């Protein structure tokens, strides 16, 4: 009896040993997505980059409600007309009206982020502007400007506007309907300020490659606010922006020709800068 138990226990031990160490067939798992593949092709990120790289973005500012000089009646209408046209043409538009100096600084800082990586970054400004010693300034509605030395504290230099567009990939454009007669000049004279270097209109500018600045009137001359609800310059801009298939260089020529005709050759818009060697359209041909 003891022998039977012993041999039974012996064979059971051998069986357990064989089962424990017999080679097992490896388990198969369903194929998993490659982590490297997922990281190299993030669908949402690619979409975002493509969308940003082809975007056309614009900041539109109309300053008319000046607090220390007579108000301008047309900049609000001009800004709304241009913003509307750009929106219809597919631009992502930010429209601002009657900004003080801090508000203008903030609007430009915010737009710098928005313009980053955009194919076409554009700023349109309607309102007062002036030139001092060859440097151009845009005038916020809360500016007093009793002395020429007030400009750095109370106005926005045009080169700062261009700096805020530096993230645009292909074309960076500033359109200025700001060459109006300077009412601040008389205030400076009355206060005995040295005004020899402060003039009406804007000075010539030399943007870098890929930057274009379009003045409502050429350097040293002034632009009309216009007898209607919009300035002659804004009227021409909107008309020719929405013409299909007008390449950018031709657009500038058509706007200039229309303003000259409307003002009986008293106002000549002017373009400064170098357009990249590529065709640009506000409304591309079909």
Where are these regions (language model features)?
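Cysteine endopeptidase catalytic domains of the caspase/legumain-like
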Residues: 1-286
